[in-house]
Amino acid sequence: MKPRFPQNVYFLARYSYLRRFQHSQRRTFSSFLNNIRSNYSGARASPLGGSSGAGAGAGGGGTGDSKGNAFLVPGATMATILMLGALHARRLYEDKKIEEKREKGIELEFHPDIKASFLGVLPLRSISRAWGSFMSLEIPVWMRPYAYKAWARAFHSNLEEAALPLEEYTSLQDFFVRSLKEGCRPIDPDPCCLVSPVDGTVLRFGELKGNRGMIEQVKGHSYSVPALLGNNSLLPMEPEGKNESKEEAVGDKSDKSWLRVSLASPKLRENVSASPMKGLYYCVIYLKPGDYHRIHSPADWNATVRRHFAGRLFPVNERATRTIRNLYVENERVVLEGIWKEGFMALAAVGATNIGSIELFIEPELRTNKPKKKLFPTEPPEERVYDPEGLGLRLEKGKEVAVFNMGSTVVLIFQAPTANTPEGSSSSSDYRFCVKQGDRVRVGQALGRWKEE
């Protein structure tokens, strides 16, 4: 009769054998790694093949571990480079697909994703302030031409237009907000045209209709103009209906919206009420990091009100416009409102990540992207009325008004002549845009024209 062993004894013996085998394998593998590390450390200590470094590395365990840590650094660096390269390749691939869709006439639609939600929890305002501090650091004189030329190659900037030699820009911040040589941006002299206030790409343009005044951010999503300019905006929106009801509604709207400013500027209300009915138009222009960053006046006009909205600082690139709702309404911005010879005009300078600082030349004391005292502030936008005794501040066509610390977006909203003609007919006095979506424009270039009747 064969002896029988208990089942648990068999499994215990099997488990003990596996443990001894695994321990032996780990010890062999550890010895192999230690040899590699010691050889690598010896090669670094003695490039010509000295044996002392290798012998020391193969010695005590503590010394081997301390020198072995250096072996992990190149691997981590290489992994980081590969990861960044993969992300960049993916971005280039997606951009290429977007360009192919545009060439085929396919318009991109709004599509929110999880990345946009993740951006909402990041401290983008603090990051932008830290970035601004870094960009303000002084660069050694000998290094400045190399740094600025590298930036120009990366973002396609024209250094020949810079007003000063590259050595005179003490920091990247000074270089970004540089002025241009005289005559680099000729201003269209036609009195019946509105010129571009910035260098950039035309994203959207058109006529505002209805009482809500919606601007299409991207196909499938729009944002409200009153939300962009503020609830106290002087915007003369017209409700849909017959011409007579339109005139009455506009009169009521003007009485309410202009009441606050008219108390301080009686001449302002007289000019607005005396001006004829006009169409309301908009134009959205995006500035890339390599573009000229100063904002100029699009026409001769009087700025009467300035509002500063301390909002978020989401990025405003093409990907962000397709994934973040109400992007321009959510972001920090400075709005200038006033009148010109054709009626209402507003210029909204919208900030973005690392571009929270917007400076006004007409109000140097204004500071944007300041630390918030509350986590979720509910206070209204900061507002200032210019020149309460008169018609506001006079801004001449083509003159510098403000500056972005990098690139961002400008939204221009204005009234222009519209002929009161039956539907389906045209008139030479109508305002017409002379740019197309996606066009590159420069300061002083005409955005649209009309003819005097």
Swiss-Prot record:
Modified residues (Pyruvic acid (Ser)): 408
Enzyme Commission number, as recorded: 4.1.1.65
Reaction it catalyzes: a 1,2-diacyl-sn-glycero-3-phospho-L-serine + H(+) = a 1,2-diacyl-sn-glycero-3-phosphoethanolamine + CO2
Annotated GO CC locations: mitochondrial inner membrane; mitochondrion
Pathway this chain belongs to: Phospholipid metabolism; phosphatidylethanolamine biosynthesis; phosphatidylethanolamine from CDP-diacylglycerol: step 2/2
Transit peptide: 1-29
A GO MF label: phosphatidylserine decarboxylase activity
Known tissue expression: Expressed in roots, leaves, stems and flowers.
Topological region Mitochondrial intermembrane: 94-453
Cofactor names: pyruvate
Cofactor note: Binds 1 pyruvoyl group covalently per subunit.
Post-translation changes: Is synthesized initially as an inactive proenzyme. Formation of the active enzyme involves a self-maturation process in which the active site pyruvoyl group is generated from an internal serine residue via an autocatalytic post-translational modification. Two non-identical subunits are generated from the proenzyme in this reaction, and the pyruvate is formed at the N-terminus of the alpha chain, which is derived from the carboxyl end of the proenzyme.
Catalytic residues of the enzyme: 199, 296, 408
UniProt enzyme class: lyase
Stored Pfam families: PS_Dcarbxylase
Effect of disrupting the coding gene: No visible phenotype under normal growth conditions.
Keywords, comma-separated and alphabetical: Decarboxylase, Lipid biosynthesis, Lipid metabolism, Lyase, Membrane, Mitochondrion, Mitochondrion inner membrane, Phospholipid biosynthesis, Phospholipid metabolism, Pyruvate, Transit peptide, Transmembrane, Transmembrane helix, Zymogen
GO biological-process terms attached to the record: phosphatidylethanolamine biosynthetic process; protein autoprocessing
Mitochondrial matrix topological segments: 30-74
Site (Cleavage (non-hydrolytic)): 407-408
Biological role stated in the UniProt entry: Catalyzes the formation of phosphatidylethanolamine (PtdEtn) from phosphatidylserine (PtdSer). Plays a central role in phospholipid metabolism and in the interorganelle trafficking of phosphatidylserine. Contributes only to a minor proportion of PtdEtn production.
Family listed: Belongs to the phosphatidylserine decarboxylase family. PSD-B subfamily. Eukaryotic type I sub-subfamily.
Assembly: Heterodimer of a large membrane-associated beta subunit and a small pyruvoyl-containing alpha subunit.
Entry protein name: Phosphatidylserine decarboxylase proenzyme 1, mitochondrial
